[in-house]
Amino acid sequence: TTLRDELSKEAGPLAAIHALHHAGYEAGVTAGTTFGGTDQVGGMSQAAFWKELGDFFSRRGWGTLAPDGEAQSVGLLASPDWVEADPTIGDPEASCSFSTGFLSGLMCSVAGGPVAVLEVECRSRGDARCGFAFGSEASIHSLYGQLVDGTDLDAALSAL
């Protein structure tokens, strides 16, 4: 059983998602100090930052995480082996709520401003990988709306 399962039993599925996302966000803000804040990150190339971020997660057993494609309105991070996902459960929804919050908190911390994150692919629901879109709150909100309306991910990203 997972922490999400136990929280869902006690508080309900939506409350569990919110609690995990919030806890992840706070943990991510704290973890952002590992990167030395905006001054240190500002001096890194994009390639160096993404390598550092990927190494941060893999050293801690979270799995591999790397940018996917060229960022336009939103960026994408992907992992074929993300630890929060459980491909055996067949969840109809994306389930990496803690990770989504953590990534948002960490990116907000290092960017020095708001960065929204949305899980757009999840191994727990049968996708080949976990994918996290990140960007401005407006861009992520627009992406979410398109996905809810049934637009596939590639088309939704192209429309932004």
Label each residue range with its predicted role.
Residues T1-G75, D81-F98, V115-A116, E121-L160:
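N-terminal accessory segment detector
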Residues C96-G112:
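Active-site helix/loop of acyl-thioester processing domains in fatty-acid/polyketide metabolism
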